[in-house]
Amino acid sequence: MKLLVEKTNEKAIIPFQAHEGDAGMDLFSVEEITLKPMERKLIHTGIKIQLPKDTEAQIRPRSGLALKHGITVLNTPGTIDEGYRGEIGIILINLGSEEFKVEEGMKIAQMVIKPTLTLKVEEVVELTETTRGENGFGSTGV
């Protein structure tokens, strides 16, 4: 399978998998932006993508940014549908206690390509019973 990438900014870096077998590809900022504590901003990557048929791209945080600085992707995982052709933008939020500077060329998120299913939705009067039933939200312990 191929992921087609179009640069919309000369500073853009094409996403890649750092190691063989990695699920995610790093996404990079094309701009310098400062995020104050509890502030969120849209960060530009300078790329558009064309996904393979029957796939989606999930945008996820980078664990190092989250652990060391409290920087995460606000709507994680963000979903890019197969038919979307606009620039990929990443909504970052600073959950840390100090300002954080996003540098040009910095790895800001990761993109994972996943298969999608097209389902036929059917309304029913009642669902089948299970042993779990409606128990959720910590019902098996905290």
From Swiss-Prot:
Coiled coil: none annotated. Its cofactor is Mg(2+). Pfam families: dUTPase. Its EC number is 3.6.1.23. GO terms for biological process: dUMP biosynthetic process; dUTP catabolic process. Pathway: Pyrimidine metabolism; dUMP biosynthesis; dUMP from dCTP (dUTP route): step 2/2. Keywords: Hydrolase, Magnesium, Metal-binding, Nucleotide metabolism. Disulfide bonds: none annotated. It catalyses: dUTP + H2O = dUMP + diphosphate + H(+). GO terms for molecular function: dUTP diphosphatase activity; magnesium ion binding. It comes from the Bacteria. Substrate binds at R62, S63, G64, N75, T79, I80, D81. Belongs to the dUTPase family. NCBIfam families: dut (TIGR00576), PRK00601.1 (NF001862). PANTHER family: DEOXYURIDINE 5'-TRIPHOSPHATE NUCLEOTIDOHYDROLASE. This enzyme is involved in nucleotide metabolism: it produces dUMP, the immediate precursor of thymidine nucleotides and it decreases the intracellular concentration of dUTP so that uracil cannot be incorporated into DNA. This is Deoxyuridine 5'-triphosphate nucleotidohydrolase. The gene is dut.
